Amino acid sequence: MSKFDDFDLDVVKVSKQDSKITPQWKSESLCTPGCVTGALQTCFLQTLTCNCKISK
């Protein structure tokens, strides 16, 4: 592994006692208020555009 010393992947070893996996990023919705699970609740377009109005 000495060939890969120039890469810092921010990997941390944990013991088996502390092996609970927790996400570092949590969110109720991607960016649209009122759409709790984002794209899964049929508001994919609003989630995709962050509830912005697009006009000519």
Curated annotation (Swiss-Prot):
GO terms for cellular component: extracellular region. The keyword Ribonucleoprotein does not apply. Belongs to the type A lantibiotic family. Transmembrane segments: none annotated. There is a cross-link at residues 32-35, 37-43, 47-50, 49-52 (Beta-methyllanthionine (Thr-Cys)). Disulfide bonds: none annotated. The keyword Zinc does not apply. The lineage of its organism: Bacteria, Bacillati, Bacillota, Bacilli, Bacillales. Keywords: Antibiotic, Antimicrobial, Bacteriocin, Lantibiotic, Thioether bond. Residues 1-24 form a propeptide. This is Lantibiotic subtilin. It comes from the Bacteria. Lanthionine-containing peptide antibiotic (lantibiotic) active on Gram-positive bacteria. The bactericidal activity of lantibiotics is based on depolarization of energized bacterial cytoplasmic membranes, initiated by the formation of aqueous transmembrane pores. GO terms for molecular function: signaling receptor binding. There is a cross-link at residues 27-31 (Lanthionine (Ser-Cys)). Subtilin activity is observed during stationary phase, but not during exponential growth. The modification 2,3-didehydroalanine (Ser) is found at residues 29, 55. Maturation of lantibiotics involves the enzymatic conversion of Thr, and Ser into dehydrated AA and the formation of thioether bonds with cysteine. This is followed by membrane translocation and cleavage of the modified precursor. Succinylated subtilin is 10-20 times less active than subtilin. The ratio subtilin/succinylated subtilin is about 1:2 after 24 hours growth. The gene is spaS. It holds the Pfam family Gallidermin.
